[in-house]
Amino acid sequence: MCANSAWAGDVRIPARPFLAAGDILERVESGFDRWFGARANPLRHLGALGFYLFWIIVASGAYLYILFDTSVSGAYPSVQSITFDQPWLGGLIRSIHRYASDAFALVIVVHTVCEFVHGRYGGFRWFTWISGVPLVWLALTSGVVGYWLVWDALAQFSAVATMEWLDALGVFGVSLARNFLTPDSIDDRLFSLFVFLHIGLPLLLLLGMWIHVKRLSQPDTQPARALAWGTLAALVALSIAVPATSAAPADLTRVAAILALDWFYLAPHALMYETSETTLWLIAAGGTLLLALCPLLSHAPRAMTARVDAGNCNGCRRCFADCPYGAISMQPHPDGRIGAELAVVSPELCAGCGICAGACPSSTPFRSVRELVTGIDMLQLPVAVLRARLRDELEQLTAAARIVVFGCVHGADVEALRSVDTGVVLLLCAGQLPPAFVEYALRHGADGVVVAACPEDGCAYRLGARWTRERLLGEREPHLRARAARSAVRMVYCGRRDLRALQQALNGLRAQVPAAKRGNGGVHV
């Protein structure tokens, strides 16, 4: 089910390619917010959780490698010794290594599905999406090879199945599966290759993960303490309750009849034997191709990029610091002044979110110039148009208590709030709002201001809601000036269907309008 794009003045309400699925996902994310809080919500920090699990896998794997015998004859006994001779150290660490790997695979799948449902795979996001596709293969291969090192019956089954699958390509000249026909066909050299792969592939995976987030400013690679400790506690509890153990030793003269598969990594083997090697290749190749083509299948319009005005850019670097996608660089100013810099926007990286315009110190509506031009601005919604729209909204309010709502087009439907006492100004992102506009609204007749942002840690442009909050609280430049009536300002985090929180904020302001006019308390966020 698709939703058509609509125009709200100069602000385009984004199309939602998977409307029903997106609504369900947002409800689940909101439910997790209530249970865990936004900062500890795993669904809002899947990338950070993936990095965290990767380092747990590396740390636990390093300990296991110290005690591991890399020979064919010594591999299985050494793993058994680690597991049973030191159950509360080696055995626990082995189980954590196993379950962290499973959790890593699960996080990759959920992260991919969530980003796809949210439509975050096309346009300026194409590189991040495409660079994530090889990570799926690297993670899967690393996990499969890790099972081989145990060299039990499950490892034998997985190794033979993998070689039979590769043999189906017919490009190796000789059968790889023949290396596993007799016990004598496996030697220490081949096993050393397995060890090399299990160490080398994660290194490539780490490199790929770095490339994956390379275009992001301040990427979310470290989960909040609550999420980190909670994840570690869950892994430890699971490891104690259901310790990871080995199957019987590998025996190439026999084929195991019953095995307990790890479905996170070894499910393709079962699928291959239920169908055929060719079928599995078609599924693998088709799935990879489909993922790689997703950016081309996106119908999202190309974002209009930010525009820099050299005459008004003073090289303050605020837009450079606040851009979520590293689309802004600083270069020498063309006027030739020593040390002067000019912001330069990369069209390929620009998301068209307007966060840079909200960061620009010249984006203030109090300027008395005839034509309001800022150092950096958005063509589809310039600051001058934003000021004119705010003035129009204030003039149309006729009630005793007058409130202005600044709303992000990716968040709640703030247009539904428009009434005789409530004006609405749409933004490309909450981060596009210069704090001076809040003070301007209050000084030109508004009794209260509500800033409606995306859910906390769920901003459509990653950092917009966060920067807005910090600007209003005076923690980030440009900040809301102290002389503004801060008690009359509310910032609300809300999803597309969440008008209740906005209504509560409006009702609270209506009830506190007299107090807001008198006092100068803190901004409510």
PLM regions with names:
Residues 318-351, 355-379:
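Iron-sulfur cluster-binding cysteine motifs and their immediate structural context
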Residues 133, 147, 158-161, 231-234, ...:
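Iron-sulfur-associated redox domains of electron-transfer enzymes in respiratory
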Residues 299-311, 366-385:
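Membrane-interfacial segments at transmembrane helix termini in multi-pass membrane proteins
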Residues 51-75, 402, 406-417:
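Conserved oxyanion/phosphate-binding beta-strand-loop segments in alpha/beta enzyme cores
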Residues 311-314, 350:
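Short Cys/His-rich zinc-binding micro-motifs
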Residues 25, 31, 35-66, 78-97, ...:
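Membrane-embedded alpha-helical bundles of multi-pass integral membrane proteins
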Residues 98-103:
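Individual alpha-helical transmembrane segments in multi-pass integral membrane proteins
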Residues 1-18:
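Short, non-transmembrane cytosolic segments of multipass membrane proteins
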